[in-house]
């Protein structure tokens, strides 16, 4: 079976075989070494010298982590949304007390940068901009 969705995905046999081995201690030196090797490789892929974080959650969990670690209740933010997961950014930010200006663009299209730019220029109190890079619900990527 070959599914054309974000997940689950077909897993190659060699990966399944590797996964059948014993678990490693996620607080031990073997895991620490694995994590550092992985983040070093991710830095190369993303062409950065900055920190790279591996988050063991769904995409929604990563969105929530981004919000709770950067915003405070009452902060004004803009969310430019083009789909279901973009809308989720608004929901999560509002749950944590942010004042969200939601710019909704047609599903299946990228955000309009002129509209976003105008919104930012019109309100100096905006602390953050939220954009879903790859909107899974429509398959559109905001560049």
Locations of regions flagged by a protein language model:
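A glycine-/small-polar-enriched, mobile loop at the entrance of the PLP active site in fold-type I
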Residues: 1-56
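Conserved beta-loop-alpha segment that forms the PLP phosphate-binding cup at the N-terminus of a helix
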Residues: 49-78, 82, 86-90
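Short coil/turn connectors at secondary-structure junctions
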Residues: 48-50, 73-76, 96-99, 123-127
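A short acidic, glycine/proline-enriched capping/turn motif at secondary-structure boundaries
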Residues: 61-62, 83-87, 99, 107-110, ...
């Amino acid at each position: 079976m070959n599914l054309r969705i974000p997940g689950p995905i077909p897993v190659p046999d060699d990966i399944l075989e590797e996964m059948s081995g014993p678990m490693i201690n996620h607080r031990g030196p073997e895991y620490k070494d694995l994590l550092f090797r992985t983040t070093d490789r991710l830095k190369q892929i993303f062409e950065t010298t900055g920190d790279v974080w591996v988050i063991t959650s769904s995409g929604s969990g990563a969105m929530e982590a981004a919000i709770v670690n950067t915003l405070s209740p009452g902060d004004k933010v803009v969310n430019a949304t083009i789909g279901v997961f973009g809308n989720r950014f608004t929901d999560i930010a509002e749950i944590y007390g942010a004042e969200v200006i939601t710019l909704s663009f047609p599903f299946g299209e990228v955000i309009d940068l002129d509209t976003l730019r105008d919104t930012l220029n019109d309100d100096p109190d905006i602390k953050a901009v939220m954009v879903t890079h790859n909107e899974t619900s429509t398959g559109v990527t905001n560049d």
